[in-house]
Amino acid sequence: MALKIAVVVGSLRRDSFNKQLAHALASLAPSDFSFDFVDIGGLPLYSQDYDSDFPEVARAFKQQIADADGLLIVTPEYNRSMPGVLKNALDWASRPWGQSVWGGKPGAIIGTSVGAIGTAIAQSHLRGVCAYLDIVLMNQPEMYIKHDESRIDANGNIVSEDTRKYLQTFMDKYAAWVRDRRV
C-alpha cells in the first residue's frame, strides 16, 4: 500500500530553493511513497471569524493534510523564523478549535537558505509550533542546509554525490519514521 506524504513548502517563490529541495528529497524516496505538494499560497490570512464559515480553499487544504500518512515540511528562514505563509497554513489546519488534522501525524522538518546556518532558527521555532499541534516529528537527523547550486540545481536535481548521500540518509530515516508511526 502506497504511503501518501503531504509536502508543505513554506515558500511561495516560483523558483524556491525549498521547492527544489523538496523535489530532490521526493526523488530519493522509496517506491511505495507518493508526494502531494500542498499549495498554501491561496489560503487567506487566518481569522477566528472564519471558524463558523470555513472557506472552501481551507477545507480542501485540511482534507489534503487529513488524507496524508505523513508530513514533510520544507521551510526557508525569513528574519530568523518561519515564513508567515507557513504559520498561516499551520493555523488553518488546526482550526476550528478541537478540529485539528495535525494531531498524531508523523512528520519531519528540513530546509535550505543562503544564510550560513541554513534554516536552523526557523526550524527551531517551527518545532515548537509542531509540538503544540501534536505533530510527531522526527528529531534526528536535523539538517540545516546552506543553499548552493552545486548541490541541487534549479530543477530539483541533485548534482553532488555527497549531497545525494546526505539527503538519502534523511529520506531513509524519514521513510522508516513514517512507516513506524503512521496513524
UniProtKB/Swiss-Prot annotation:
It comes from Burkholderia sp. Binds 1 FMN per subunit. Belongs to the SsuE family. Its EC number is 1.6.5.7. Homotetramer. One of its GO terms (cellular component) is cytosol. The keyword Oxidoreductase applies. This is 2-hydroxy-1,4-benzoquinone reductase. The keyword Metal-binding does not apply. FMN binds at residues 11-18, 77-80, 113. Keywords: Flavoprotein, FMN, NAD, Oxidoreductase. Its cofactor is FMN. It holds the Pfam family FMN_red. Optimum pH is 5.0. Involved in the metabolism of 4-aminophenol. Catalyzes the reduction of the auto-oxidation product 2-hydroxy-1,4-benzoquinone back to hydroxyquinol. Has a broad substrate specificity toward benzoquinones, converting them to the corresponding 1,4-benzenediols. It catalyses: 2-hydroxy-1,4-benzoquinone + NADH + 2 H(+) = benzene-1,2,4-triol + NAD(+). GO terms for molecular function: 2-hydroxy-1,4-benzoquinone reductase (NADH) activity; FMN binding. It is an enzyme of class 1 (oxidoreductase).
